[in-house]
A protein has these predicted regions:
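Short linear motifs in low-complexity or flexible loops
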Residues: 12-15
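Ubiquitin-like/PB1-type beta-grasp interaction modules and other compact soluble beta-rich domains
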Residues: 2, 7-10, 21-182
Length: 182
């Protein structure tokens, strides 16, 4: 009786090994990735290094010494994915804190903070901007659909984009904060 039990165990073990071999040969990451598109993503805040005096108290420790939160990283994405989708994906995968809100007026996500560095942390003109292939889109990141081979750079600006090359010679318009009483 015991002999039958040992034979059954061996047969079951062999069957499990064959199933595992079959699953790894047919499935796995390589096949999932085969039809995927790819882009590169970089997240940097090097402009803050020149404005450390303007940085909010307690924020100096979160700024990397080289200003790079995420070096250029290749990311697989699907057809129709946006810059926002890929930012969420890479931040989740790399353990980088990212916070956003939906802005109905622009029908897009607005990035409030990445790596615990938020808008206005380095002055009233500071915040996150993105470029794709060296171009700074004038619309939200969830409105930009990526293409295979795109290069996305998220940059923290301390001067409404001038310090990262987004506003080259364009006039700067800041809404008035004055209130008038009637």
């Amino acid at each position: 009786m015991r002999r039958c039990s040992v034979a059954k165990r061996r047969a079951l073990a062999l069957l499990l090994c064959l199933l595992l071999l079959l699953c790894t040969a047919c499935g796995g990451q390589a096949q999932e990735d085969a039809g995927a598109l790819h882009c590169t993503v970089r997240i940097e805040c090097s402009t803050v290094l020149a404005h450390m005096d303007d940085l909010k108290a307690g924020k100096a420790d979160i700024v990397p010494s080289d200003g790079v939160l995420l070096p250029e990283t290749t990311v697989a994405f699907s057809e129709g994915d946006t810059v926002f989708d890929v930012l969420q994906q890479v931040c989740r995968a790399q353990g980088i804190h990212m916070e956003s809100t939906w802005t109905p007026a622009y029908n897009s996500a607005y990035i409030e903070g990445i790596g615990n560095l938020y808008e206005f942390d380095c002055g009233e003109l500071s915040g996150w901007m993105y470029s794709v292939n060296g171009v700074w889109p004038d619309y939200g990141c969830s409105g930009y659909t990526l293409h295979d081979g795109d290069t996305v750079v998220w940059s923290y600006t301390c001067d409404l984009g001038r310090d990262v090359g987004a506003l080259q010679g364009e006039p700067l318009t800041i809404p008035s904060r004055r209130c008038t009483r009637r």
